[in-house]
Regions:
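Short, acidic loop-to-helix structural element flanking the phosphoryl-transfer center
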Residues: 78-106, 112-116, 144
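Short helix-capping segments at alpha-helix termini
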Residues: 31-37, 100, 122-126, 155-156
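N-terminal helical cap/lid subdomain that shapes the substrate entry/recognition surface
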Residues: 2-92, 96
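Asp-based, Mg2+/Mn2+-dependent phosphohydrolase catalytic module
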Residues: 1-4, 112, 116-217
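Conserved SAM-binding loop
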Residues: 14, 104, 163-164
Length: 217
């Protein structure tokens, strides 16, 4: 295999979750705390892409620190009650990658405990390392901290890893860490996102099958 370690984003890369969980959670939160604010699913996805979820909540929704904490609790409670499905074919890819001796790690904006729950619920190979939203804000994507921590923990060089993500923060992190990046384009078809990712990503997969061939062939 070309890579010894897959570093996977979680939402809309491994599991189909933004449309079914994260967006509905925000809609319900806004009904209470921002009743005059309305956002479509596509608009929400674009805002997650640029400027990113933290900046979206703080700068666009202008949540106070107290409201930000409330939204975080509201979102996590919603996530705990809803388990997303893994994309068809992902399980087989991860199983084969592990069987060949590869490492599987996660760098995500979801909580570690919820990521682990989703992997278990979908009968996926348990990741070797998981870095999630529990990290301080300055260490989350697009900061390079998680990739650097993975390389240190597993004694790997930058060219032995590949980051797989559907959004820009993962690409920025990988580029800044000198790690290869694969754009995951199989979750949705939002023009603003797919246009950027297909243009800017040297490696971009529209389907899970394309990803399988790239990683395992």
């Amino acid at each position: 295999m070309k890579y010894k370690c897959l570093v996977l984003d979680h939402d809309d890369t491994v599991v189909d979750s933004t449309a079914s969980i994260h967006y509905p959670s925000l809609v319900e939160f806004c009904k209470i705390y921002r009743p005059d604010y309305h956002v479509t699913l596509e608009e929400y996805m674009v805002l997650n892409f640029e400027p990113g979820i933290y900046e979206y909540l703080k700068d666009i929704l202008q949540l106070s620190d107290e409201e930000f904490d409330l939204e975080n609790e509201f979102w996590n409670d919603y996530v705990l009650k809803h388990i997303p499905h893994a994309f068809k074919g992902i399980k087989e890819i991860l199983e084969e990658f592990k069987a060949r001796g590869g490492y599987i790690c996660v760098s995500s904006h979801s909580y570690k405990e919820n990521i682990l729950r989703d992997y278990k619920a979908n009968d996926l190979p348990i990741p070797d390392l998981i870095y999630g939203w529990e990290l301080p804000q300055e260490k989350r994507k697009p900061a390079t901290y998680t990739l650097e921590a993975i390389m240190k923990e597993l004694n790997l060089k930058p060219d032995e890893l590949v980051m797989v993500d559907d959004l820009k923060p993962g690409k920025v992190m990988a580029d800044n860490a000198g790690v290869d990046f694969i754009g995951a384009g199989w979750a949705y078809d939002v023009k603003a996102i797919t246009d950027y990712m297909s243009k800017e990503c040297k490696l971009y997969c529209k389907t899970v099958e394309e990803f399988k061939k790239l990683i395992l062939d």
